[in-house]
């Protein structure tokens, strides 16, 4: 499992969008018991804080201490620094295991073996992510896609391709439940977009190699198209893989 977000942990916590309530509703409808959940690669606890409203106990793990330090604190969430592939949890512990926007960084065979070990019989595994945002303005969206594909494109890690493929390229050796299509819809000003772009691992890779931030020049260009404090509807496509019985095919 790779740690790609320690350096920008505070930015990640502030500017990453929340997942839609309908996604959680569907996951809960397909979970037999709401006792104990594991949110793996929790980041800043975005998913864990929602699960905590429904489960007696949520264990939230991440490989990054800085991410854990920036995580939201809730009484029934227990945070710890652990990898996805090897944990200290007991066998048959969890009713639900979730991974949000992170499984593309995992060693899949080892993670799935760990899932098999720590999941209760008939537990649910839910894995989801979101891809590039679409700003509801054709000119701005064209510039944003160009920034993603061309300016920062060479600086994305190889694993990013799994996001672009909506996880179709990631093995999922369990019986899948057909899932609806979801989206994250936000109303953003330009400052929010700037913060989100600065949370990208590709942005940090670019800075390390070139000594300057590519987002700065992009935002200067955007200011000719996007007025200060002007609100734009922005949509992130969300994709979900879900299994209820965790039987290896």
Residue ranges of each PLM-predicted region?
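Class I SAM-dependent methyltransferase SAM/SAH-binding core
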Residues: 38, 44-86
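Conserved catalytic/acceptor-binding region of the Class I
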Residues: 121-186
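A short glycine-rich, Lys/Arg-flanked "PGG" loop and its adjoining helix->strand segment in the class I
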Residues: 110-122
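A short acidic, Gly/Pro-enriched loop at the edge of an enzyme's catalytic core
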Residues: 85-96
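Conserved Class I S-adenosyl-L-methionine
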Residues: 165-249
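Class I SAM-dependent methyltransferase Rossmann-like catalytic core
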Residues: 4-17
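Conserved alpha-helix/loop element of class I SAM-dependent methyltransferases that forms part
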Residues: 17-35
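A short SAM/SAH-binding and catalytic strip from SAM-dependent methyltransferases
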Residues: 95-109
């Amino acid at each position: 499992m790779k740690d790609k977000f320690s350096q920008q942990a505070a930015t990640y916590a502030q500017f990453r969008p929340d997942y839609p309530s309908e996604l959680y509703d569907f996951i809960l409808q397909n979970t037999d018991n709401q006792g104990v959940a594991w949110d793996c690669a929790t980041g800043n606890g975005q998913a864990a804080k929602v699960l905590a409203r429904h489960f007696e106990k949520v264990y939230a793990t991440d490989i990054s201490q800085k991410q854990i330090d920036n995580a939201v604190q809730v009484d029934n969430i227990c945070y710890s620094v652990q990898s996805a592939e090897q944990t200290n949890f007991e066998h048959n512990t969890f009713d639900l295991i979730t991974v949000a926007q992170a499984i593309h960084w995992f060693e899949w065979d080892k993670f799935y073996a760990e899932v098999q070990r720590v999941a209760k019989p008939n537990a649910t595994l839910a894995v989801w992510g979101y891809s590039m945002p679409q700003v509801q303005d054709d000119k701005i969206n064209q510039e944003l896609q160009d920034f993603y594909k061309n300016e920062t494109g060479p600086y994305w890690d190889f694993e990013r391709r799994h996001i672009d493929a909506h996880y179709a390229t990631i093995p999922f050796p369990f019986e899948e439940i057909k899932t609806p299509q979801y989206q994250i819809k936000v109303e953003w000003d330009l400052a929010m977009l700037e913060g989100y772009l600065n949370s990208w691992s590709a942005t940090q890779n670019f800075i390390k190699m070139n000594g300057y931030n590519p987002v700065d020049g992009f935002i200067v260009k955007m200011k000719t198209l996007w007025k200060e404090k002007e609100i734009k509807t922005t949509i992130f496509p969300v994709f979900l893989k879900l299994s209820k019985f965790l039987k290896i095919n």
